[in-house]
A protein has these predicted regions:
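Mid-domain, small-residue-enriched loop/turn segments at the edges of structured enzyme/sensor domains
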Residues: 41, 116, 134-193
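Conserved catalytic neighborhood of penicillin-recognizing serine enzymes
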Residues: 100-135, 143
Length: 286
């Protein structure tokens, strides 16, 4: 068993023998400050990975655009099909120029040879490749089937209605392609620690998230040496930004953190900075 596999297998073991975790209100002060700085709603939740206990939250049951954070849920659905013998990670899918949508840095390089399901999930999560996400959505039956998968998990809040890139439109009061921080955190926890996926599939999902290459300016920028993080960011119209993550000290995840914001006129750099500062406060008062 590799060190990574050992780590994920023992997540419940380590957490079960930790002392109770108590959150600190200082982080919520920073979340509220971020709202003021961005002139936008910010949703935040911090969940204990083992128990599922909510440690802190702000607007946990308000809807926010999912943006590209949905890609983790999508690959969870794909892995569920793999576990059921309905899909193979090594199956190669061919695509054409007509399939390409904006921001497809990986799939645009494979028009001649195609990509395996494993490679598409890696591209969707680590590089946020939009065409990869659409191709994977096709394999499960489209956005409505992802929503059905989530419903079967017990998540009756999170919904995907459209494809990339339209799902990032983020129209105010539009419930399409949205989630709530509490629902997303609970669903992510189930995917990473529950019995829905096999151990191998849970490991694969967290490996893809750990290898995320496009979330550097967010929580990762505030992470001390030796800390673990597996995450997925998202960006959308109308100042929307978000991140979902499993993180913790000593090289292993112990909490789920979800942050969403929408409705800001701030630049992308400023949105990134505010989320990074929330992360810095979280870590300081861990």
């Amino acid at each position: 068993m590799s060190i990574q596999h050992f780590r994920v297998a023992l997540i419940p073991f380590f957490a079960a023998f930790c002392l109770p975790v108590f959150a600190h209100p200082e982080t919520l002060v920073k979340v509220k400050d971020a709202e003021d700085q961005l002139g936008a709603r910010v949703g935040y939740i911090e969940l204990d990975l083992n128990s599922g206990k909510i440690l802190e939250s702000f607007r946990p049951e308000e809807r926010f655009p999912m943006m590209s954070t949905f890609k983790v849920l999508l690959c969870g659905a794909v892995l569920s099909r793999v576990d059921a013998g309905q899909e193979q990670l090594g199956r190669r899918i061919h695509h054409s120029q007509n399939d390409l949508v904006e921001y497809s840095p990986v799939t645009e390089k494979h028009l001649t040879d195609g990509m395996t399901v494993r490679e598409l999930c890696s591209a969707a999560i680590t590089m946020s490749d939009n065409t990869a996400a659409n191709l994977l959505l096709t394999t499960i039956g489209g956005p409505k089937e992802l929503t059905a998968f989530l419903h079967n998990m017990g998540d009756h809040v999170t919904r995907l209605d459209r494809w990339e890139p339209e799902l990032n439109e983020a129209i105010p009061n539009d419930e399409r392609d949205t989630t709530m921080p509490a629902a997303m955190a609970t669903t992510l926890r189930k995917l990473l620690t529950g019995e829905l996926l096999t151990l191998a599939s849970r490991q694969q999902l967290i490996d893809w998230m750990e290898a995320d290459k496009v979330a550097g300016p967010l929580l990762r920028s505030a992470l001390p040496a030796g800390w673990f993080i597996a995450d997925k960011s998202g960006a959308g119209e109308r100042g929307s930004r978000g991140i979902i993550a499993a993180l913790g000290p000593d090289g292993k995840p112990s909490r789920i953190v979800v942050i969403y914001t929408t409705g800001s006129q701030a630049t992308m750099d400023e949105r990134n900075r505010q989320i990074a500062e929330i992360g810095a406060s979280l870590i300081k008062h861990w």
